[in-house]
Amino acid sequence: MMWTKPEVTEMRFGFEVTMYVCNR
């Protein structure tokens, strides 16, 4: 992912957090 849009970054961050919580 080479996007530099803040919206995309926020979405990706939220997605990573969700995956982390699901993997716990």
UniProtKB/Swiss-Prot annotation:
It comes from the Bacteria. Pfam families: PqqA (PF08042). There is a cross-link at E16-Y20 (Pyrroloquinoline quinone (Glu-Tyr)). GO terms for biological process: pyrroloquinoline quinone biosynthetic process. Pathway: Cofactor biosynthesis; pyrroloquinoline quinone biosynthesis. Keywords: PQQ biosynthesis. Required for coenzyme pyrroloquinoline quinone (PQQ) biosynthesis. PQQ is probably formed by cross-linking a specific glutamate to a specific tyrosine residue and excising these residues from the peptide. Belongs to the PqqA family. This is Coenzyme PQQ synthesis protein A. It comes from Methylobacillus flagellatus. The lineage of its organism: Bacteria, Pseudomonadati, Pseudomonadota, Betaproteobacteria, Nitrosomonadales.
